[in-house]
């Protein structure tokens, strides 16, 4: 079996050693080169043609952002960002530029933390063999075009074009309308979520809940970033937060988000992951809870990601009479979670990322005309 060939790019000697040690503990991985800055990194990528690059963002001579732009344009390669929590805002910019995923940077002498980081890195490296690089490049170029277009509009507009929507006065909602849109994602999820949420109208008549596999400490910055870009109210969920129309709750990293109905209100409950939860925040835990609490008024959406998280949830939503969507293979960065959801046989529609927001809006009763 051919090994996964990796180049490690980091100006810190300690980080290079720690990352290399983590990688070389995987029998299917071979570290084939190192670089201490972006310029050297580009030369190594061109010469060695690795399957994967681990990348520090802050380096001398050429930073990780510049390297990402050049690599994605001329030599598309899978990139996992290695970042400290103090750089979490920069991580999401790197994901926009085409990085596949990120892991927290190891710190000296914290053995328990290093073990957790190693497990996270191993899982994401193994996902490289399922990677849709063409989809990443297509997504990155579409986002660049969208950003340029956004610059031509007024400063108050969202960075993605919205579908034409009807107002409540011209389109009365049916009695059995959806109450919640629940979206789950993993690898490749942050840019996909940004694209979808920024295309929804500010007066969105449903609540939106999101579980994105992400370490503790990063989800708050992710939510704050999306809140600045989207017309919706977006925040990291706290225990007891109300689930209400026009609001997006993002499950906090390292925890699961479930729901509890209290009279006419529904509240989020933030709970510790179960022993069977391989991925956290768990998409299945969120979707199963939605099926129980919201029943047929649930729209479940499974986006890009490794593994099968979400497949139990879509089955439960279907049994409860709700609706489900899955991202199409051609746009999914990793077609693992959507594939497993589709394999249940209960997904109502398979939708490419570029049409997902329109499909959600249509199913929520707002879209005036769909082709």
Curated annotation (Swiss-Prot):
Q: Which residues form the CheB-type methylesterase domain?
A: 174-362
User: EC?
Assistant: 3.1.1.61, 3.5.1.44
From the UniProt record, list the reaction(s) this protein catalyses: [protein]-L-glutamate 5-O-methyl ester + H2O = L-glutamyl-[protein] + methanol + H(+); L-glutaminyl-[protein] + H2O = L-glutamyl-[protein] + NH4(+)
Gene Ontology annotations for the cellular component aspect, listed alphabetically:
cytoplasm
Q: Which Gene3D superfamilies match?
A: 3.40.50.2300, Methylesterase CheB, C-terminal domain (3.40.50.180)
Recite the UniProt keywords alphabetically. Chemotaxis, Cytoplasm, Hydrolase, Phosphoprotein
4-aspartylphosphate modification, residue list = 56
Give the Gene Ontology MF terms in alphabetical order.
phosphorelay response regulator activity; protein-glutamate methylesterase activity; protein-glutamine glutaminase activity
Q: How is it modified after translation?
A: Phosphorylated by CheA. Phosphorylation of the N-terminal regulatory domain activates the methylesterase activity.
Q: Which SUPFAM superfamilies match?
A: CheY-like, Methylesterase CheB, C-terminal domain
Active site location: 186, 213, 309
Which GO BP terms apply?
chemotaxis
Give residue ranges for domain Response regulatory.
5-120
Locations listed in the record: Cytoplasm
- Name the source's superkingdom: Bacteria
Q: What is known of its domains?
A: Contains a C-terminal catalytic domain, and an N-terminal region which modulates catalytic activity.
NCBIfam families, A to Z: PRK00742.1 (NF001965)
PANTHER family assigned: PROTEIN-GLUTAMATE METHYLESTERASE/PROTEIN-GLUTAMINE GLUTAMINASE, PROTEIN-GLUTAMATE METHYLESTERASE_PROTEIN-GLUTAMINE GLUTAMINASE
Family designation: Belongs to the CheB family.
What this chain does, per the entry, is described as: Involved in chemotaxis. Part of a chemotaxis signal transduction system that modulates chemotaxis in response to various stimuli. Catalyzes the demethylation of specific methylglutamate residues introduced into the chemoreceptors (methyl-accepting chemotaxis proteins or MCP) by CheR. Also mediates the irreversible deamidation of specific glutamine residues to glutamic acid.
| Name this polypeptide is given | Protein-glutamate methylesterase/protein-glutamine glutaminase 3
Q: Which organism is it from?
A: Geobacter sulfurreducens (strain ATCC 51573 / DSM 12127 / PCA)
**Gene name of the record:** cheB3
């Amino acid at each position: 079996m051919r090994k996964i060939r990796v180049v490690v790019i980091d100006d810190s000697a300690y980080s290079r050693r720690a990352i290399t040690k983590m990688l070389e503990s995987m029998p299917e991985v071979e570290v084939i080169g190192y670089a201490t800055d972006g310029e050297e990194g580009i030369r190594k990528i061109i010469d060695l043609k690795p399957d994967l690059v681990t990348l520090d963002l802050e380096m001398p001579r050429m930073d990780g952002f510049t390297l990402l732009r050049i690599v994605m344009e001329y030599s598309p390669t899978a990139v996992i960002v290695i970042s400290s929590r103090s750089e979490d805002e920069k991580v999401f910019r790197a994901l926009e530029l085409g990085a596949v995923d990120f892991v927290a940077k190891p710190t000296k002498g914290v053995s328990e933390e290093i073990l957790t980081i190693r497990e996270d890195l191993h899982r994401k490296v193994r996902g490289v063999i399922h990677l849709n690089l063409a989809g990443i490049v297509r997504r990155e170029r579409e986002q660049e075009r969208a950003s340029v277009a956004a610059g031509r509009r007024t400063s108050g507009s969202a960075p993605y074009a919205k579908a034409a929507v009807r107002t409540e006065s011209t389109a009365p909602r049916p009695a059995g309308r959806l109450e919640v849109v629940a979206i789950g994602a993993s690898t490749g999820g942050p840019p996909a979520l940004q694209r979808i949420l920024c295309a929804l109208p500010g007066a969105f008549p449903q609540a939106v809940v999101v579980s994105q596999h992400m370490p503790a400490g990063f989800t708050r910055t992710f939510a704050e970033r999306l809140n600045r870009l989207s017309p919706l109210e977006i925040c990291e969920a706290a225990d007891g937060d109300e689930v209400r129309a026009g609001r997006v709750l993002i499950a906090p990293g390292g925890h699961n988000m479930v729901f509890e109905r209290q009279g006419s209100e529904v509240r989020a409950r933030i709970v510790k992951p179960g022993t069977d939860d391989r991925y956290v925040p768990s998409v299945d835990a969120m979707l199963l809870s939605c099926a129980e609490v919201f029943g047929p008024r649930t729209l479940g959406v499974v986006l890009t990601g490794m593994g099968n998280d979400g497949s139990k949830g879509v089955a439960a939503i279907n049994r409860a009479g709700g609706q489900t969507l899955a991202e199409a293979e051609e746009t999914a960065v990793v077609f693992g979670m959507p594939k497993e959801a589709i394999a249940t046989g209960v997904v109502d529609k398979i939708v490419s990322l570029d049409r997902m927001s329109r499909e959600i809006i249509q199913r929520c009763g707002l879209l005036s005309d769909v082709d």
